[in-house]
Amino acid sequence: MKQLLDFIPLIIFFALYKFYDIYVATGALIAATTVQVIVTYAMYKKVEKMQLITFVMVALFGGMTLALHDDNFIKWKVTIVYVVFALGLTISQIMGKPAIKGMLGKELTLPDAVWSTINWAWVMFFSGCAALNLYVAYHLPLDVWVNFKVFGLLAATLVFTLLTGGYIYKHLPHEPKQKNQ
């Protein structure tokens, strides 16, 4: 349910962009993200840091997009969110407390080296997405950027999450099979 809730603002943004324009879509994105945070808090009594960072960035850069009638701000929002996530993971790694382990470590027992590898992999993923977003945003038409933002980055994140899951599975402690006596 929570994962579905995370996609609703993105779906609304895409639909309103296709029917109207980037400014209507951006206004709706701000409103939908605000409602999403409120509903998440009402249902779970907490809001995750990543969701709060995304909300603040949507409100800030979306607001600037609308106030200045300049779609460059909403384009930059995507890159800045990814850079913030990459920096957060980098800082957590340097401090010896990989954020990925903090998020998943209660459910999974893995060696510290594995957590470190996963953490650095996500740093690289977020950094790559940030750079790729800038390229698409400023070298291709707005329609292409919107499709990339909604479908390309979503698909890349899904694939990378699955790859991370496979890497985790490979390193999970497996109980030896017992022989029937």
Curated annotation (Swiss-Prot):
Q: Which Pfam families match?
A: IspA
Q: Which residues cross the membrane?
A: 10-30, 50-70, 80-100, 120-140, 148-168
- The source's domain of life comes to Bacteria
This protein's record includes keyword DNA repair: no
Alphabetized, the UniProt keywords read: Cell inner membrane, Cell membrane, Membrane, Transmembrane, Transmembrane helix
Per UniProt, subcellular location reads as:
Cell inner membrane
Topology in membrane: Multi-pass membrane protein
User: Which sequence ranges form a coiled-coil region, renumbered to this chain?
Assistant: none
Example GO CC term: the record gives: plasma membrane
User: Which InterPro entries would you find in this protein's record?
Assistant: YciB
Q: Which PANTHER family match?
A: INNER MEMBRANE-SPANNING PROTEIN YCIB (PTHR36917:SF1), INTRACELLULAR SEPTATION PROTEIN A-RELATED (PTHR36917)
Described function: Plays a role in cell envelope biogenesis, maintenance of cell envelope integrity and membrane homeostasis.
The family classification in the record reads:
Belongs to the YciB family.
What's the protein called, per UniProt? Answer: Inner membrane-spanning protein YciB
